[in-house]
Amino acid sequence: MTFFLNLYKKRRMTDQELGIFGEQMAQKFLLKNGYLIRKVNYRYLKFEIDIIAEKDEKIVVVEVKTRQTAEIGEPWMAVTRKKQRQIIFCANEYIQSRDLPNEVRFDIISIVHNQFRTKLEHIEDAFST
């Protein structure tokens, strides 16, 4: 699912501002589409999950990647196999420590945001255990 929004910013965002913007936009998108946000920026040891949500009695772990341009590739391409393993490890701890059902889906929300437009792409089942 891809959405385009025409937004204009007078100055270029810092990487930190862009990351925060992307995570907030992803949360709004998920809520609008019927997801319950369970946790944001969940940390375990040195690992982090951007968003843990729930929909249709399934835990949905979401990695958000935001870039100002897709010139070197779409943001979702930055979720390497190593990063996937780290997210899975962290998600397993979250689920086991809360005695939640083991049915989990791993999604990526990929956002390109700049002064000309914002493009959001939600990739469901982007990777698996």
Protein language model regions, located:
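Acidic-basic catalytic patches of nuclease active cores, encompassing PD-(D/E)XK
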Residues: 1-40
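Short acidic/glycine-enriched loop/turn segments that link adjacent beta-strands
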Residues: 15, 44-47, 116
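Conserved catalytic cores of phosphodiester-cleaving nucleases, focusing on short active-site segments
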Residues: 30, 49-72, 81, 87
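Active-site metal-binding core of divalent-cation-utilizing nuclease and nuclease-like domains
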Residues: 36-61, 128
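Positively charged, solvent-exposed patches that mediate nucleic-acid binding
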Residues: 42, 54-55, 76, 92, ...
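Domain-level recognition of nuclease-like catalytic cores that cleave nucleotide substrates
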Residues: 96-129
